[in-house]
């Protein structure tokens, strides 16, 4: 059994079952000096940030976000589209509605799915 520790309060407006998935996603994005930008559908609410707390505080302010991951040199690794309260009450991975398809994003998604896929909370 894997025990996952996470902040039960962030992102504040995400469903509680979505929070561990989102937090682990951000952890993967920030590995190896990565940076994250967040497009909330209206503006970049986060731009090139490496602070997990700042990123999480700015997620779920709208009904969806696009999380863009960058490596330490500023090259885009890929993006993940998050839609909040989208039927994830029983399946937390549903918060990730889409992602750019490449080796890096597929690896991140598979690792998240290995932890959270098929789990009903």
What is the predicted function of each stretch?
Residues 2-60:
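Negatively charged, low-complexity tracts enriched in Asp/Glu with abundant Ser/Thr
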Residues 36-110:
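Acidic, low-complexity, intrinsically disordered interaction modules
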Residues 19, 31, 77, 110-111, ...:
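Arginine residue identity/basic-tract feature
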Residues 1-13, 90-121:
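Mixed-charge, Lys/Arg-enriched low-complexity segments
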């Amino acid at each position: 059994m894997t025990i996952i520790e996470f902040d039960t309060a962030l992102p504040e407006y995400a469903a509680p079952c979505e929070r561990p998935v989102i937090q682990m996603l951000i952890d993967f994005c920030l590995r190896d000096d990565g940076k994250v930008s967040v497009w909330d559908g209206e503006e970049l609410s986060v731009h090139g940030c490496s602070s997990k707390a700042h990123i999480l505080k700015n997620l779920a302010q709208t009904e969806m976000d696009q999380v863009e991951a960058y490596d330490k040199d500023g090259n885009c690794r890929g993006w993940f589209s998050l839609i909040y309260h989208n039927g994830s009450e029983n399946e937390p991975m549903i918060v990730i509605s889409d992602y750019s398809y490449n080796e890096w994003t597929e690896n991140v998604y598979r690792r998240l799915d290995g932890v959270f896929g098929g789990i009903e909370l």
